[in-house]
Amino acid sequence: MFQTKLRNESWEDLQKMSCTTEIQVAFILSSFMTFISGLIILLIFRLIWRTVKKWQIIKGTGIILELFTSGSIRRNHVRSLHFHGRFRDRIEMLLSAQTFVGQVLVILVFVLSIGSLIIYFINSADPVGSCSSYEDKTIPVDLVFNAFFSFYFGLRFMAADDKIKFWLEMNSIVDIFTIPPTFISYYLKSNWLGLRFLRALRLLELPRILQILRAIKTSNSVKFSKLLSIVLSTWFTAAGFIHLVENSGDPWLKGRNSQNISYFDSVYLVMATTSTVGFGDVVAKTSLGRTFIIFFTLGSLILFANYIPEMVELFANKRKYTSSYEALKGKKFIVVCGNITVDSVTAFLRNFLRRKSGEINTEIVFLGESPPSLELETIFKCYLAYTTFISGSAMKWEDLRRVAVESAEACLIIANPLCSDSHAEDISNIMRVLSIKNYDSTTRIIIQILQSHNKVYLPKIPSWDWDAGDNIICFAELKLGFIAQGCLVPGLCTFLTSLFVEQNRKVTPKQTWQKHFLNSMKNNILTQRLSDDFAGMSFPEVARLCFLKMHLLLIAIEYKSLFTDGFCGLILNPPAQIRIHKNTLGFFIAETPKEVKRALFYCSVCHDDVFIPELITNCGCKSRSRQHVTVPAVKIVKKCMKGLSSHMAGQDSPPRVHASPSRISDFTTRTFPHDVEQDSDQLDSSGMFHWCKPISLDKVTLKRSRKLKHKFRNHIVACVFGDAQSALIGLRNFVMPLRASNYTRKELKDIVFIGSLDYLQREWRFLRNFPQIYILPGCALYSGDLHAANIEQCSMCVVLSPPSKPSSSQTLVDAEAILATLTIGSLQIDSSSDSSPSVSEETASCTNGHNEKSNCRKVPILIELKNPSNIHFIEQLGGLEGSLQETNLHLSTAFSTGTVFSGSFLDSLLATSFYNYHVLELLQMLVTGGVSSQLEQHLDKDKVYGVADSCTTLLSGRNRCKMGLLSLHQTILSDVNPRNTFGQLFCGSLDLFGILCVGLYRIIDEEELNPENKRFVITRPANEFKLLPSDLVFCAIPFSTACYKRNEEFSSQKSYEIIKEASQTTETHSDTNFPPTIYSVDETSYSPVYSYPSRTNSVYSANQTARNQIRTNSSITSQKPLGDNAKKNGKKISDEISDEDPFAYSEPL
């Protein structure tokens, strides 16, 4: 028994005998000598090869060269090269795993490497200083593995193009330092651990092997496998080095400071070092070990800081954002997809959640195609009660099922207005609509579109349903429509924008005008169903009653005809012939929804004697349930007005205005010029816009003349930036409101585009059917091109922002527009030298508080900014001291005066359209010149590119209300008396002329700070708001109403001078199809009026009655007639214009 035990111990000692220093040096030197000698040999061969190549180039031909170029040797050499090339190609196919054999080879190498590493782990249980005998069974297995590695190393060496680069690769170094010691162990009949721990670096091939095996397919799994392989290979390799040096000790101390440490303890030490947490139970004692720990700690800080948090984030995001949304019964939610970024989400949430917390009962599910960034994730956490983020794509039905889009109230698709390729952005969003509609055809879609011509694809989707709430928000159409309205009526762009912008930021105004402007910014467009007690009353009667009793400004209604095929739509300021029906929807300008509730609660019985708006609440009166037709509407109105008159006797409220018969006759006579011209104008088949035959680009392209600049006057100059490769911004959307049919042909202003001819040529195919459009090749950055367009006499100069460019800075996106504004703003114009001021001059030269006029004025300008934060550049150019010190565009002085516009607020329309799509319809009606969703479908068909085919179509399209900017003294508003307050003016203009006053355009009162007499916008002033003589009034004017007054002192000599100037202008532009605007005698004898169109419809039988009355009263009018000469001259000019128009009754395209 004792002998057996002794024999076993002697056998173990034979297997684990001590390794001498010479044996360890032999193992290490075999690796280093192989590496160094191989590298030296490769360098020598490369040096010799380069020397031979260089010598061949210098010598040209020689004995050796001729020897190599002889016939037989050359053929053998070419054959050898061919064989070598094919052999290398085969090896490369194997090593790249492109074939099945190659995949098996790569996988086998990885598996054998892991097997060799496992053998190292087994052998590491023995002391490092011991050598295993060749009787150890793991040594032959490891020898076989390394023999295969040698074969694989040779294949890789032959396939490498750069041998030296291959020799220095990490996998090559691993093979060089692990394969030679194996063969040395076979020779010495003993094995030593040595540097075999380097085999752990083969773990870096793990992601590639898993991809070959199709084990991982997603990007997250590939990223995770890569991070895991890096961490494990680093840990195992570093632990092997610590295990070697700590068990061997420092060589110069001959191992006296060594310690017995296992490989597991080394791994533990490395992990503790990587996490920068050391407990001190396992430490390095050797100098080599401590030096290695110092450098490894620095590397581990980078590794731990970069890779470990990313791994944690991968696990967290996978669990957090790949789940499904649980749609609970009775819980409302919407799905938002598309451009999910920090800016878009912030803008959407700010507008969608701007209601009170108790009123928000809709959850928002964001469907993003990529995991949210840390900043976006923070936003979602701030709105955790309302938002949920799901990672997925609207293109995949699986992801749509995960967000339960079929149960959602609506699906909102966000676009990126600052993208470099707007067409691609639109197409991707349209594809999302197709995917959602194919998945569930009943899902309501609200989509943002950047370019207007891409809208046509959406109504063609079979399941698209306007009646179900599907809606399109077109940025180009609305943005350019706003700018066009600012050209027609100065300040109107700011007026309309302020109604759709809600400011939550508190600002303390320093001046009186700032206080008025900021208070007016509180107003919004709100809708409310009208009380049934208004049924049977006319719109002016209801608007007056709401204004006086409820302090509400009613501007429009949703009219539904009682006939089956009658009109149904929105009407701005309907005429008195339109009667209010039950359940009519009204549009108000008010501050809060609570205020407009009064229009629903109003009761003619309970609230007849109530004159405090806050007391008009829901009365619950039984009479409200009865049908209102039992009481005539006239009696109700008389009763209400009687109560109002008795109440206003002791208060400052505006009294009812009465007009004398002479004034009414004067007003009726003024409507005549419009009706005479209706039938002579050429319109499109819808009757909404002025139309003409297609005009070639050459006929409207203006040439630079050295003698005289083009005789434009009171025209619109549009500065456009772009080239042949720029994306189209859709100038048709800018032109259409300026060519609305509720202007006569003489009232149309010439439009001159200044820009690159290559760009405008691409836009011209959408503009060629509109009259009086001209193109001046050039650039708005050069004053010479501006003077060529006679910018001194223009009514408005518009600077449109250039199309977005790839990888452009958000700050520099408006650089060209800002520089153009600087150039235009530097132009000083002497207004005293003009014989007859233009429209813009009339506004800019209005008298101030001291009845003085400025002799020098600047060109009226309206600039578009894509980036609202660039407003501080425009503020510096404003020339107005003491301005609002704000970086917010909508709180800036430039915005308050109507000189700047940005479409950034259009993002809020997405939430507005979801809550109340009627508001979006009203906005489209106001800014587009009357384009509706139904009309858009027809405009894209060739058959409507012609003239109106009937008088009915023409009248139904033209008789739309339009907005204007009227003076208190030079227009028919001077007939309103008294007009000391806004309430008095509102009631008087509505009673006398049917004109609806909605706001003011007032001169900034501080003269020393406002040398240019700039005006600011006041939206919906209070009823008691005091008026100033210099105020201009924003009004909704009926189409048939002429707002100018006759100039009694107009001389015939002045008429002759203007006619002469007009004829010269016509001769100057004889080479174009449509000459610039020519002012006839009748036009110049009236004060100009700003006006703009908006889509309304009314009962047109009243207009025919009015025209009959005009013809009857024209013979007995008391107005002083113009001289016979003036009448003849005016008729002559009208005839000339008709003769020169070559596009009368054009054919369809």
From Swiss-Prot:
Chain ranges passing through the membrane: 25-45, 102-122, 139-159, 164-184, 189-209, 227-247, 292-312
Tissue expression notes: Testis-specific.
Single GO molecular function: potassium channel activity
Region (Disordered): 829-851, 1106-1149
Extracellular side: 1-24, 123-138, 185-188, 248-259, 283-291
Intramembrane segments: 260-282
Motif Selectivity for potassium positions after renumbering to this chain: 276-279
Membrane topology qualifier: Multi-pass membrane protein
Family membership noted in the UniProt record: Belongs to the potassium channel family. Calcium-activated (TC 1.A.1.3) subfamily. KCa5.1/KCNU1 sub-subfamily.
Name the UniProt record assigns to this protein: Potassium channel subfamily U member 1
Cytoplasmic side: 46-101, 160-163, 210-226, 313-1149
Organism: Macaca fascicularis
Pfam families registered for this protein in UniProt: BK_channel_a, Ion_trans, Slo-like_RCK, Slowpoke_C
Catalytic activity: K(+)(in) = K(+)(out)
Alphabetized UniProt keyword annotations: Cell membrane, Cell projection, Cilium, Flagellum, Ion channel, Ion transport, Membrane, Potassium, Potassium channel, Potassium transport, Transmembrane, Transmembrane helix, Transport, Voltage-gated channel
PANTHER family: CALCIUM-ACTIVATED POTASSIUM CHANNEL ALPHA CHAIN, POTASSIUM CHANNEL SUBFAMILY U MEMBER 1
GO cellular component, one term: plasma membrane
